[in-house]
């Protein structure tokens, strides 16, 4: 794979029954890219997110092109999907803490090593401890409590609600909890389908800044053009089952699209002029004998 490439789809076909949803899809995710997927309602935007998330499988095109999905190592993909918390009696805090299970396991092992190192000078123990410390820092394991509380405050959820059962929240509130859980998980590739739904303006403005500086990749489907303009740097448009990549935010995409349409219309006009010129020439000369034919007729 190319340098900084996290994820790549090559020549994918997605169809349900005999209905083609996406055809010959080539899609790339580079490190730290913020990507929007745009297109008309029903064109396959959410279908593409589901393909990336692994919820559905692609079909292979009937061609000689190499088809498939490739990733740079193991990529953790997180998808803000339709909320479906199965354990309704679990508190919000208990649900959120599931994200930090690797942190807690790492912390537990570090405490065990600390006790072992009190009575042993084994360098292997020290090396393992150093590795675990580095892992804790990479997972933001030393600040998980603060990160969790900050997220809840940003999303307008009171800290006392951490003790409430998930089932006692409305659908919109549960969506917020799911969103907080995803952000705290910090996946390598974050998939967001209409992320600004159920959010007030201050939260949206905070989210814009957070995603823009997020140090991993984000893929967004949203009708909020202002939000996209603030966050994304790449746009993929799905049109007539196919997909095209544009560099820049939503406004830049629209400008490039308009310029392409103007060029297309100009090329069409030039083509029609050439067709007319050739047609007129043929009409003018089709019944006129050539010099060779005239000579032979003598």
Regions found by a protein language model. Name each.
Residues 256-278, 282-298:
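Intracellular alpha-helical coupling/juxtamembrane segments of multi-pass membrane proteins
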């Amino acid at each position: 794979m190319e340098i900084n490439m996290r994820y790549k789809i090559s020549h994918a076909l997605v169809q349900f029954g005999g209905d083609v949803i996406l055809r010959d899809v080539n899609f790339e995710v580079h490190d730290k890219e913020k990507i929007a997927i745009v297109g008309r309602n029903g064109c396959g935007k959410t279908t593409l997110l589901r393909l990336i998330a692994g919820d559905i499988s692609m079909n292979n095109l009937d061609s000689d092109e190499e088809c498939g999905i490739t990733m740079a190592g193991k990529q953790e993909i997180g998808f803000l999907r339709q909320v479906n918390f199965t354990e309704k009696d679990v508190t919000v805090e208990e649900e959120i803490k599931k994200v930090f299970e690797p942190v807690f396991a790492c912390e537990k092992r570090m405490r065990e090593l600390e006790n072992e190192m009190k009575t042993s000078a084994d360098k292997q123990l020290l090396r393992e401890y150093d590795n675990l410390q580095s892992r804790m820092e990479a997972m933001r394991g030393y600040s998980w409590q603060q990160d969790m509380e900050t997220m809840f405050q940003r999303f307008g959820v009171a800290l006392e609600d951490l003790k409430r059962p998930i089932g006692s929240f409305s659908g919109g509130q549960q969506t917020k909890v799911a969103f907080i859980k995803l952000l705290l998980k910090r996946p390598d590739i974050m998939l967001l389908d209409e992320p600004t739904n159920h959010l007030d303006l201050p939260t949206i403005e905070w989210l814009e800044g957070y995603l823009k500086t997020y140090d991993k990749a984000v893929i967004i489907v949203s009708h909020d053009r202002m939000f996209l303009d603030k966050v994304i740097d790449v746009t993929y448009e799905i049109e007539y089952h196919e997909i095209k990549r544009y560099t820049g935010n939503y406004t830049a995409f629209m400008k490039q699209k308009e310029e392409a349409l103007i060029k297309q219309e100009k090329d069409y006009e030039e083509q029609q002029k050439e067709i007319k010129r050739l047609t007129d020439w043929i009409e003018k000369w089709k019944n006129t004998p050539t010099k060779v034919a005239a000579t032979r007729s003598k």
